[in-house]
């Protein structure tokens, strides 16, 4: 059976969330549906049938729509093993494979603690759906994990192929770039990205997806060993963890 090309579209929710819709013009997957209403509307408009739900972590803005979706569609929900959920789900963790045959797509689960302790991401040959771990030009706040855990998680993502498309779940790119420029005011890649993102947002388009290559050149949380960042962070020790911890704190108050 020939598979239709996979299409990936953001469904905007709340103030700045993206619920990711993956479909082949017939069947669909949603990732982190914090709100059911826009998902149901999109499925109806596009004449799609929901076939699976993927969850990266337990925060309400990522799972709030699951119960309502399950009332309309009896589908599997894949969610982190190390977190609790108020709905039936298939618990998955590090190294497990989710085989979505109707999309000719396989996701490997990565356990990436930091934002929450059980946070997972879904990675394929071409795509990374990383919830609130890696943001476009930023990273998630440390609600449950330690700086060391988050840094280790981000360092794992740095090793993915450079052309991997990065799909996170918040439209934070503009402010993240502005913060990054306080640490690397001479980084031309950041200025170029700021201009590109400003135009996208002006046109009411998402700034996502990013790529691992783009993040490596513009995301300060993946660049803690850069001399400019070390200098502007004003740390007494220049090791990667100390720098990461400081700039995460600076971003919290930016």
Question: Where are the model-predicted features located?
Answer:
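Accessory terminal helices/loops
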Residues: 155-165, 174-254
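A short acidic, helix-capping loop that chelates divalent metal ions and anchors anionic groups
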Residues: 85-87, 137-143, 176
């Amino acid at each position: 059976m020939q598979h239709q090309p996979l299409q990936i579209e953001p469904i905007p929710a709340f103030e700045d969330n993206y619920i990711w819709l993956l479909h082949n013009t017939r069947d669909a997957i949603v990732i982190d549906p914090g709100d059911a209403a826009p998902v149901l509307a999109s499925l109806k408009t596009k004449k799609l049938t929901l076939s699976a739900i993927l969850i990266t972590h337990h925060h309400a803005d990522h799972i709030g729509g699951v119960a309502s979706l399950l009332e309309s569609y009896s589908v599997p929900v894949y969610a982190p093993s190390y977190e609790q959920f108020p709905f039936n789900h298939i618990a998955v963790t590090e190294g497990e494979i989710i085989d979505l045959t109707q999309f000719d797509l396989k996701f490997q689960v990565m356990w990436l603690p930091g934002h929450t302790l059980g946070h997972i991401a879904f990675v394929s040959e071409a795509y990374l759906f990383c919830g609130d771990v890696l943001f476009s030009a930023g990273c998630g706040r440390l609600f449950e994990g330690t700086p060391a855990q988050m840094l280790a998680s981000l360092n794992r993502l740095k090793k993915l192929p450079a052309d991997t498309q990065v799909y996170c779940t918040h439209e934070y790119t503009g402010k993240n770039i502005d913060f990054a420029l306080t640490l690397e005011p001479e980084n031309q890649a950041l200025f170029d990205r700021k201009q590109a993102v400003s135009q996208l947002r002006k046109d009411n388009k998402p700034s996502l997806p990013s790529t691992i290559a783009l993040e490596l050149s513009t995301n300060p949380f993946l660049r803690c060993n850069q001399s400019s960042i070390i200098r502007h962070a004003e740390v007494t020790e220049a090791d990667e963890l100390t720098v990461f911890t400081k700039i995460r704190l600076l971003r919290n108050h930016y």
